[in-house]
Amino acid sequence: MLFEFEDENLNPIYEKVRFHERLSLEDGVTLWKTQDLLGVGYLANQVRERMNGDKTYFIHNRHINPTNICIHSCQFCAFGVKEDHPHAYEKSLDEIFSDAEKYNGGDVSEFHIVGGLHPDLPFEYYLDMLKGLKVRFPEVHIQAFTAIELEYLAKLAKLPLDETLLTLKDAGLGSIPGGGAEIFAKRVRKKICGEKLIGEHWLSVHEAAHGLGLKSNATMLYGHLETVEERADHLVRLRELQD
């Protein structure tokens, strides 16, 4: 090995990476705690090159936020507001299509659609939004609705989650974003977003989407109340879902 780690605790992890062995939660904690940033970068690049060669990919997307009105009040959220807030808004479908028309002038390849859980907008609003965008921009991929939104839309539609996902997919949904995962640890979620669905439900929504051929992203909100161990646990749970 030509690279020399400043932190000798990374040497056992390097051996695992070299022999394609799976890292443990404890390894994840070590990687979070080490000050050897170049060492972590070296390890990550070994895996990146093995999986993707020397290729890097980007997409050109545009965010569409139909509304910022939300029934929840998550402690960390600066987006969602109540209906009587002076900055509250809800866009008509015509406004959304008009916005998309402006965006698409720049060779956009994806519309990323997320918003608040509006107390009054019907399921048909979201369905017609997907259909309208797909008719107008058939070449643009639509990634829309976090797991929290999808669970809420299923309630609006009065359908099981699988049927809701299929209905949305038929209307033009291509994949789902990873928002709302925050940190899966119950201790933390109870304090920062107790009204949201629990981590296990977030994972089950994504599992259902994968079962229907929909791909998804995943996020992690960190740097607040969580421990390093809870960060590592979050990543392990995502990896288990990916399995």
Say what each PLM segment does.
Residues 1-63, 67-71:
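Flexible, acidic/Gly-rich N-terminal and inter-domain linker regions that tether
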Residues 137, 170-181, 200-243:
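Conserved C-terminal portion of the radical SAM core fold
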Residues 100, 126-131, 162-165, 203-206, ...:
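Generic structural signal for well-ordered alpha-helices
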Residues 83, 112, 117-120, 147-154, ...:
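Conserved radical SAM core fold
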Residues 39-83, 88-114:
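N-terminal pre-triad scaffold of radical SAM enzymes
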Residues 85-98, 123-125, 158-160, 200-201, ...:
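Glycine-rich anion/phosphate-binding loops
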Residues 20, 44, 74, 113, ...:
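Conserved, mostly hydrophobic/aromatic
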Residues 111-136, 153-157, 226-230:
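Conserved glycine-rich "GG(E/T)P / GGGxP" loop and the immediately following alpha-helix
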